[in-house]
């Protein structure tokens, strides 16, 4: 049974405008990335050939996950409580910790499905939570 559904869309240019462009060292000081990404995700952001697109997709995925939890970001759920990764085939995965994991348990959720898509100007994500 579906216990949560969330979707989000992000304009990639808005995210790219908040990323320093002076090289790899500048990426290390990106405040938005530090606020949104976990340490593991941040390392991949810095190594990415398209850091703006990477961050936009992760931002959309985390917002979609928070909406599926019924809280949005806030109310005990932070960006740091939601981690986006990829399986060996490249499919996106979402993992919950701390407040996000507690909220998932309150909903009776046990599985999360994540889809991320991007085009030239936008990144979008959808999360479905199942019991």
Swiss-Prot record:
- The EC number on file is 2.7.8.7
Which lineage do the record's taxonomy fields give for this organism?
Bacteria, Pseudomonadati, Pseudomonadota, Gammaproteobacteria, Alteromonadales
**Which reactions are catalysed by this chain?**
apo-[ACP] + CoA = holo-[ACP] + adenosine 3',5'-bisphosphate + H(+)
The broad enzyme category this protein falls into is: transferase
Q: Where does Mg(2+) bind?
A: 8, 63
A GO molecular function held by the record: holo-[acyl-carrier-protein] synthase activity
InterPro entries, A to Z: 4-PPantetheinyl_Trfase_dom, 4-PPantetheinyl_Trfase_dom_sf, ACPS, Ppantetheine-prot_Trfase_dom
Q: What family does the Swiss-Prot or TrEMBL record give for this protein?
A: Belongs to the P-Pant transferase superfamily. AcpS family.
GO cellular component labels? cytoplasm
Q: Which GO terms describe its biological process?
A: fatty acid biosynthetic process
Give the required cofactors.
Answer: Mg(2+)
Keyword Coiled coil present in the record's keywords: the answer is no
> Where is it located?
Cytoplasm
User: From what superkingdom does this record's organism come?
Assistant: Bacteria
Protein name per its UniProtKB record: Holo-[acyl-carrier-protein] synthase
The answer to whether UniProt assigns keyword Lipid biosynthesis to this entry is: yes
Which keywords belong to this entry? Cytoplasm, Fatty acid biosynthesis, Fatty acid metabolism, Lipid biosynthesis, Lipid metabolism, Magnesium, Metal-binding, Transferase
| Annotated function | Transfers the 4'-phosphopantetheine moiety from coenzyme A to a Ser of acyl-carrier-protein.
Species this chain originates from: Shewanella halifaxensis (strain HAW-EB4)
């Amino acid at each position: 049974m579906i216990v949560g559904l969330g979707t989000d869309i992000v304009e990639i240019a808005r995210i790219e405008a908040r990323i320093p462009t002076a090289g790899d060292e500048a990426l290390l000081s990106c405040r938005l990335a530090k606020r949104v990404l976990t340490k593991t995700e941040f390392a991949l952001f810095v190594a990415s050939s398209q850091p703006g697109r990477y961050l936009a997709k992760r931002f959309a995925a985390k917002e979609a996950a928070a909406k599926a939890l019924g809280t949005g970001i806030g109310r005990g759920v932070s960006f740091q409580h939601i981690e986006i990764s990829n399986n060996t085939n490249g499919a996106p995965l979402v993992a919950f910790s701390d407040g996000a994991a507690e909220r998932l348990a309150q909903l009776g959720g046990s599985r999360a499905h994540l889809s991320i898509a991007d085009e030239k100007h936008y990144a979008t994500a959808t999360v479905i939570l199942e019991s």
